Each structure stands twice: as structure tokens, then as C-alpha cells.
Amino acid sequence: MGGLASELMDYGCEKVYIAEDPQLSLYQGDFYTDLLSKLIDENKPETILWGATIIGTEFSARVAAKLKTGLTAHCIDLYIADIKGKPRLAQVVPGWGGNIALIIICNANPQMATVKPGLMAKPPQRKVEGEIIPIAAEVIKNIIVGETKQSRAETIEIVEEEPEEMPLEEAEIVVAGGWGLNSLGG
């Protein structure tokens, strides 16, 4: 975990919270949601950005629901807008089948948005001397052994498969054709 925390600081993160417990080694939505929601309640961040991955999409929706805040999914652009003299995260999403772009502003905090991995360029590194904050073992245990006593989901087996082809989102060049192409020759 320390390597990831260091990499986050290479990109400007000033505080990195680390929760380590054997029961957190695999994603378990209920434990992760309770733990992150507690951290958000205590630290009051203005904005939370998520990767629009399989886990990120599900995890972000759980946290947004628990915190009773908005979540804008699959943003194609983000920027800070001045709304009534207050900086807010402008979240741009495709609408109407991709023919228009909609700008969404969430008035509640935390503002939350998901972005597809690789959609935006990595920012230049700006290494900071950040702080790694371990989450106390008793805090983790209280969440894991709270009301439910166990996760409602259980991992039975992990099967890792090598992809046969490169995932589309990782390709540098994508060529696509519509119904107008009758053959390879056009």
C-alpha cells in the first residue's frame, strides 16, 4: 500500500488514508462503503472523483446514496466553475445519444463524479510531501464487526483470465464503421 500512497503524492495528494485489514483485501461493497462514508463524514471533502470501472461505478453509487449526495456518472470533462461566487465542480456528460453535452453542477457536498479510466491525460507530476494516515485498527474492526457481523457478499473463488485482445479503451487508435459500410471496401 505504501507504494500506491507514494505515487498519489507524486501527483499532488497531500493526505492519503490507508485502511489495512485482511477482511478488506478483496472488495466488499458494504464494508468499503461504511468505512469511506465514515472518513468523508469526518473530513468533509468538497469533491470526490472515482474511476468509472466496474467496482468504482458500484462503490461510488453506494457511497453517494449513503451520504445523500449527487453522483454524476461517466463524465467526459470536468472543470471548476464560479457559481454565485462559489467554486463548484462542473461535470460534463454526453446526453441525447451523444449529440449534445450536458453540464451538471451539484450544489451539495461532497460533489461526486465518475470518469472512465484513460479518458483524460495524466496531470504533470507535482510531488508533495504528503501525509500517510493509517486508519486505526479499532475503527476498521467496528465497521467490519458492526451490526451485520459479516459482509452480505462472500468471495468464493477468484478466476483470473488473460484477455484475448486488447481492451478497446486501451487502444491508441480505434477504427469503426456504421451501417453504411457494406463491405471492407466501403
Predicted feature residues:
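N-terminal glycine-rich FAD/FM-binding segment characteristic of electron-transfer flavoproteins
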Residues: M1-G186
